[in-house]
Design a protein with these regions (language model features):
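Active-site neighborhoods and metal-handling regions in enzymes and metal-associated proteins
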Residues: 1-211
Length: 211
């Protein structure tokens, strides 16, 4: 993973009416993914070659770039290449992501159902082990959640680091238990669990308060 808790790769994509070039760490692209991309007319190039590519582009193009967010080095190269005309505008992909189609909505629902099953199994195990007198900590919460989520064949990665906060720790903003600093769970009080996962069909973010 290029970004923690995110199953995506850092990349640039240069798209024109006649070609598409994906700049990515090609060593991380599986043969299956490479074949699929090439079948769809997408050429792979190394991530670090994007600036050199843009500087050498000779085909006249008007390039849409969201200037408030685009990498400044990329923007400079675009501006300095006489073959390229930069047009500032909102990334159309962001606009499209803001409105889900029926397939995306259905997949999101299935991801949440799948995650709910993992959450129920987690709570059953947590309660039964506490009732049996076992010593559990905030770190144990993370371990149990990961066990049930990762057992699903569509699981990819946690969508963020699990926040398991018992008692007074739940009042701390973005609290995170560590091996050096964590609380032991008791059969009283409150346990706040903020967690989520990314599956092939959707991403979840679940906040639970367990008494």
């Amino acid at each position: 993973m290029d970004i923690e808790c995110t199953p995506y790769a850092m990349a640039y994509c240069y798209v024109t009416p006649s070609r598409a070039v994906l700049f990515i760490n090609t060593a991380r692209v599986t043969p299956e993914a490479k074949a699929e991309l090439e079948t769809n007319g997408i050429t792979l190039a190394e991530y670090d070659d994007v600036l050199k590519f843009l500087a050498a582009e000779t085909e006249p193009q008007t390039v849409l770039a969201e200037c408030s967010t685009v990498n400044y080095a990329v923007y400079q190269v675009l501006e300095q290449n006489p073959a390229l005309t930069v047009k500032d505008g909102t990334d159309p992909l962001l606009m499209m992501k803001g409105v889900k189609n029926e397939t995306e909505l259905a997949h999101t629902k299935q991801a949440h159902i799948r995650d709910a099953v993992a959450m129920v199994r987690f709570q059953i195990e947590l309660e039964s082990r506490l009732a049996a007198g076992e010593t559990l900590t905030e770190l144990t919460v993370d371990e149990i959640l990961h066990k049930y989520r990762s057992a699903d064949d569509k699981f990819l990665v946690e969508s963020f680091d699990t926040i398991a906060a018992y008692g007074g720790n739940a009042a701390m903003m973005h609290y995170h238990a560590t091996p050096e600093d964590h609380a032991v769970l008791q059969r009283k009080g409150f346990l706040l669990v903020d967690s989520g996962a990314t599956y092939l069909d959707g991403t979840t973010d679940i906040l639970s308060l367990i008494h």
